[in-house]
């Protein structure tokens, strides 16, 4: 009987040690990696459009910073944007607007410096459920956004990028959408006189919806 108790005690001790030193599964896999965010840049007269593709398996909070510099390398403006819910496998665009003078004219810039950081988002991503249709009319581009999710959302943002016939960016803007309720839609438009040219191509990115 004493031998049996000793064997049971030894077995329990082994089980406790194995449990204590066994690695916790899944924790490392859920931590997003900055290396899985691919970034591309397109500079134009009024600023820089930066696109981000999240190749992580979870939504991330993206904090992006961009500094504009003049010909001497002096920083003339610093911009910061936060995307609280960049969904897994989603591609978004952030428009960093160049600084303007007291008359509202864009201050010329020569170069820029960009940096970003990420963390796991605390929100659930519904950006795939926001659909936008576009209609390039004679004097304006008309858009209709609709929430096809079954949730009441609180934050929705889109970036719209306009290109000329060569593919160069001629204008960009970010819009906050208010189609928060299920099946709710929102109509909005962009006048071509803001662009100074009729665009040949329009790209729409849903930056976040949560």
What residue ranges belong to the model's regions?
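Asparagine-centered strand-capping/turn motif at beta-strand->loop junctions
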Residues: 52-56, 145-150
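Beta-strand signatures of extracellular beta-sandwich domains
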Residues: 63-69, 157-163
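Short acidic/proline- and small/hydrophobic-mixed sequence motifs that coincide with surface turns
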Residues: 57-62, 76, 150-155, 169-170
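Bacterial N-terminal signal peptides that target proteins for export
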Residues: 1-11
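Terminal connector regions
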Residues: 32-35, 43, 98-140, 189-210
């Amino acid at each position: 009987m004493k031998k049996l108790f000793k064997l049971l005690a030894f077995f329990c001790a082994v089980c406790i040690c194995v449990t204590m030193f066994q690695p916790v599964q899944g924790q490392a896999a859920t931590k997003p990696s900055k290396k899985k965010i691919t970034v591309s840049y397109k500079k134009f007269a009024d600023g820089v459009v930066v696109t981000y593709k999240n190749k992580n398996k979870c939504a991330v909070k993206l904090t992006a910073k961009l500094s504009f510099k003049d010909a001497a390398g002096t920083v003339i403006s610093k911009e910061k944007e936060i995307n609280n819910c960049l969904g897994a496998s989603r591609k978004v665009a952030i428009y960093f607007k160049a600084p303007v003078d007291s008359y509202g004219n864009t201050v010329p810039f020569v170069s820029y410096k960009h940096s970003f950081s990420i963390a796991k988002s605390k929100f659930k991503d519904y950006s795939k459920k926001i659909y936008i249709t576009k209609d390039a009319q004679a004097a304006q581009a008309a858009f209709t956004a609709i929430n096809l999710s079954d949730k009441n959302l609180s934050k929705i943002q889109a970036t719209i990028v306009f290109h000329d016939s060569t593919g160069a960016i001629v204008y960009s803007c970010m819009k906050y959408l208010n189609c928060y309720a299920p099946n709710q839609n929102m109509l909005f438009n962009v006048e071509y006189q803001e662009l100074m040219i009729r665009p040949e191509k329009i790209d729409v990115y849903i930056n976040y919806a949560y």
